[in-house]
């Protein structure tokens, strides 16, 4: 049995109650997410259910793209995202392992790739 410890998030940002404070689906603190470093990110809803897990070589641009892109797997569910957690993981192999592991252990609702559990 492989034992993987999920990293503690380096940054957590939450949707603001007053959406006019932000032009990106209620999130105002994207500046707290590194622009230059790689890692993994998790999107959660207001019940703290895992919605989506992703990885990136440059975190902030990739996360923002999910809220702007017409082909993002969460494009129809952006309003559900109330919390974003970010873990800095510079090694690309480690990012790949963590992403796949978290998708399956957390049963991420909107991930389509790397899914090895049966969706309900």
Spell out what each predicted region is.
Residues 1-57, 96-97:
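GIY-YIG nuclease catalytic motif and its immediate N-terminal context
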């Amino acid at each position: 049995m492989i034992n993987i410890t999920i990293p503690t998030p380096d940054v957590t940002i939450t949707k603001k109650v007053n959406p006019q404070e932000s032009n990106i689906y209620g999130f105002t603190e994207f500046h707290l997410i590194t622009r230059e470093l790689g890692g993994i990110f998790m999107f959660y809803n207001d019940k703290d259910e895992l919605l989506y897990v992703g990885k990136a070589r440059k975190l902030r641009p990739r996360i923002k793209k999910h809220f702007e892109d017409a082909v993002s797997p969460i494009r129809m569910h952006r309003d559900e995202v109330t919390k974003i957690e970010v873990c800095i993981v510079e090694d690309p192999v480690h990012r790949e392992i963590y992403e796949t592991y978290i998708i399956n252990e957390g049963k991420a609702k909107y991930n389509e790739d790397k899914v090895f559990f049966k969706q309900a």
